[in-house]
Structure formats: structure tokens, C-alpha cells
Amino acid sequence: MEYRINQRTGDRISVLGFGTSYIAEAGERDAVAAIQRAYAGGINYYDLATAEGRTFPYFGAALGAVRKNVFYQIHFGADYTSGTYGWSTDGETIRRSIEWQLAQLKTDYIDYGFIHCIDEFSDWQEYQRNGAFDYLTRMKEQGVVKHIGLSSHTPSTIQRVLDEVSVDMLMFSVNPGYDYQKGDYAKGSVDERSAIYRRCEAEGIGISVMKPFSGGQLLDAAISPFGKALTQYQCIQYALDRPGVLTVLPGMSSVAQVEHLLGFFGATEAEKDYSMIGSFSPAEAVGKCVYCNHCKPCPMGIDIG
């Protein structure tokens, strides 16, 4: 496993994290086994924006005994009071959901408490007006929340929220399709998305990556916006090469999936090389750096790491 340091918090975070969007489908036994295999493999960062509330007791069972060794990214606005995911900006609803989540996780603190899914600036205004942000900041003041984060798909909204509030982590959708305006959540121009990476890097805000495979589209030539398939390892490397990125959070629901993704660290450079996207990227990508490092040192003077 490889780790990167969050410059604002000092946390040492695994570059491969654990996404939970569909883990509930696996059932408790398989889910717990997958989570424990991830932990054994060095994964220490877990996102808890999941489709089903029953995911939380799985994590309580799997990681309750080693809670101090892992980081939970928990979303203030993801409502599980009905048993399944719902989005809410109501402070009281969020309070009930968070208290339930903590009980199921067998913990009394949250490493990263996230302002959840703010895709329009009006969402942020509603989040403040309805008491959600007040509740989050109160939990931070009480020490229940250690650090505050923001999740969004929209670069222009991210910029405006970051102008108003200090956060230590940003959850952002990162993959070559979205970066070149291809896909359902491909929001913002190439330059707007690049500006987010650069701002986060400059200000020490860590980026945790959601949707690294564009919901599986990039892995299937038949539905890829490029007409060709990428591998999971190529997509992970692409995301890790963006400025500011600390960890990539693919969804996992089985031991086999976890082991395959952990195989990234034993893969050859050729297996992780995504430089070929330059041969089939959309027209708007022409002339834009994709940080593949193959022209290093950059003839245009871009810092490509």
C-alpha cells in the first residue's frame, strides 16, 4: 500500500480507499469479509455514502475493533432514517441519521464530516438555511467531527463554497471521461476542472475521488465515450496523477474485487499507463496536459510531478 499525507490534517491516507455505493448487495458475510480484506491490505480510508443503511452495521462488525486505525468519511446530508439513501439539508433529520450511523459503526467520532452533495450553489444556501451546516459545525466544535469536507460534482459550485468555508478534504468525481466533458456527471470545462485540482493542491485540500471508472462506462468499449476500454488500474493511476488527489474510492463488495484492486500496487508501469488516451480523447482535450509524465520534463514548463 502507498500513502499520502493530508497537508491540512497530517493524516496518512491510503491512496486506494474503499467506496461503499453498492456493498449492501453483497450481504453481511461477504461484505464484512471484503472490508476486513481491504483493511488487511492496508486500506485505511472508507467512504460511507452508501445506497443502503444496512451497510453501517457491516462496518461496525468488520472494523469496530480497529476503529482507531481507520478514517471514516461520513456525509452530513445522506439520510438513512428510512433505511435507504436519501438527500436532506434539514438539520434535525441529519442529526437523527448521524446518531444512528455512529451507533451502527460502533464509534463516537467522525474523522471527516462532509457537507454532502452540493452540486448547485442554491444547495449550499439551502444547506445553511435549514440547519445542516450549523449541526456539522457544532459537532466539529464538540470534537465529534475531527475535520470538515465537501462533496460535489460541480467545479463552479466548489469554487464558491471554498471561498466561504474552510474544508480539509474535497470529494470530487475524477476520471478521463469527466475531465473531457463526457459522462452524466461531467460538469465543468477542462479548464474549470483543472483549476479545482490546482486550487486544492495549492491550499492543501486533499481530494478523495469518487466515480473513478465513470460508473463502469470507461471499462467497456461498447459504452465508453472514447469508444475504447480502459482498465481499472489505468483509471486509478489517472486519478492519482491529478494534482491534489490523496485517495481513490472505487466501489467494492467482494474479497475478489478487493484483491484485484490491491493488485494495482504490484502492476507494471505498462499496466497502469494511460498515455494512450491522448490518441482517442475528445477534441476539446487537444493541447491539454493529462499528467501522464511521458514528456517529462514538460517542454511547456508545466509541473507534472
Can you describe what each PLM-predicted range is?
Residues 6, 18, 46, 59, ...:
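Conserved, mostly hydrophobic/aromatic
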Residues 1-76, 80, 141:
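N-terminal binding-site loop/beta-alpha segment at the start of enzyme catalytic domains
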Residues 16-29, 76-95, 121-125, 220-229:
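Active-site mouth loops of central-metabolism enzymes
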Residues 44-50, 146-150, 247-249:
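Short catalytic-loop micro-motif centered on adjacent basic/acidic residues
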Residues 39, 43-44, 191-305:
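Structured C-terminal cap/extension of enzyme domains
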Residues 26-29, 36, 40, 86-208, ...:
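Glycine/proline-rich, positively charged
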Residues 69-73, 166-175, 269-275:
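Short hydrophobic/aromatic-enriched beta-strand-loop microsegments
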Residues 21-23, 49-51, 75-79, 115-118, ...:
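Active-site beta-loop-alpha junctions enriched in small/polar residues
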